């Protein structure tokens, strides 16, 4: 039985590279991780896209989003949907959960929050395209939905 040393070396290097990428994820599998106090302290973690040559969509959604109205100080509740086509990197979902939770004490208008989420998402993973939709619960009888897209449509 002949052993292909080149193939063995290649498999070893692939396994080491995968382990290094997994080691870079600081939240996944860690039950003692603390929520960041603000979006500025939060970090969206990424991992390599397993199919970078294919256009496919990833959809995240949560109805557990809260930020603070900058005028009244009252909480604004929202459903956040993020739909994106990854390029080289994908966003790890637990880091996204922690990132979104970091807005709980953030005073900002709904439009600013939605656009900031989009900007941070694009900065983290440089997707081919992404749409962030934030459906804020009614306050004063009016519900508000904000949709921000990348790349900008002309």
Tell me the role of every PLM-derived stretch.
Residues 2-154:
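N-terminal intrinsically disordered, cationic/polar leader segments
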């Amino acid at each position: 039985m002949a052993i292909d040393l080149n193939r063995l070396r290649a498999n070893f290097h692939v396994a080491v590279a995968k382990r290094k990428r997994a080691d870079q994820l600081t939240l996944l599998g860690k039950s003692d991780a603390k929520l960041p106090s603000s979006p500025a302290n939060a970090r969206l973690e990424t991992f390599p896209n397993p199919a970078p040559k294919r256009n496919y969509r990833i959809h995240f959604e949560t109805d557990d989003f809260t930020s603070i109205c900058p005028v009244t100080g009252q909480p604004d509740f929202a459903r956040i949907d993020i739909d994106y086509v990854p390029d080289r990197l994908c966003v790890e979902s637990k880091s996204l959960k922690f990132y979104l939770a970091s807005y709980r004490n953030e005073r900002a208008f709904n439009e600013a929050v939605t656009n900031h989420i989009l900007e941070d998402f694009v900065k983290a993973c440089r997707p081919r395209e992404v749409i962030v939709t934030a459906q804020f619960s009614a306050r004063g009888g009016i519900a508000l939905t904000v949709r921000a897209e990348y790349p900008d449509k002309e």
